[in-house]
Amino acid sequence: RYLGGLHNTANGHLHPLNLCIGEAQALNALGGAIYEQSRVVAIEPGALPVVRTEAGSITAKTVVLAGNAYMGGLVPKLSKQVLPSASSVIATAPLSPELAQQILPGDVAVCDPRTALDYFRLSADRRLLFGGLSNYTGMEPKNLKGVMYKKMTQVFPELENTAIDYAWSGWIGIGINRMPQLGQLSDNIHYIQAYSGHGVAPTHMMARVTAEKIAGESTR
């Protein structure tokens, strides 16, 4: 399926959920708090912006909007700049050491250069994680395992008849110009969004730039 590729030994790959959990634990250790299942229904700008949820409100000196594809219609100006796109992943049953080495020598992580890219790597227990299928409807296909299995075996025919143990989907935010977006709606309301499926590294870079701006330390 592929005519060639670039092997970059300077890059690495990681377990994104473990990264998220580790960062949440670091935030808690610094005295921060995370409130899940707290849908924001309105943001009122001002000298002290007010963020309203379905159960109450929060007044803050600074607000950062980082909901990406999950912002909905909360801020129409931002919603018009990002298209939620469903990206799906399947995980095979654990592969034999020989088969795992055959399909991905060196335990590398791979992605292709398309905007709606495919990506794949091995898990610690030698499952192949194969992701992609970005579509612009934001909807998960009814036969997710079947659709992703077909894509996987086009790349790895060696995996014909391999069981698929897990399948899931989530939204990624595709920017209208295919570039990440950051900026301000006012002096104290910032936003960062639209990573087009490449968010693990850029989210951290853009968060740092935004934090420096808020702290008055930005020289970029």
Question: Language-model features: where?
Answer:
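Active-site nucleophile and cofactor-binding loops and adjacent substrate-binding regions
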Residues: N8-T9, A167-S169, Q193-G199
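Secondary-structure transition/capping motifs at alpha-helix termini
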Residues: N28-A33, T153-N161, E217
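Helical element adjacent to the flavin cofactor pocket in flavoenzyme catalytic cores
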Residues: G5-K61
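Conserved Rossmann-fold dehydrogenase catalytic segment
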Residues: R1-Y2
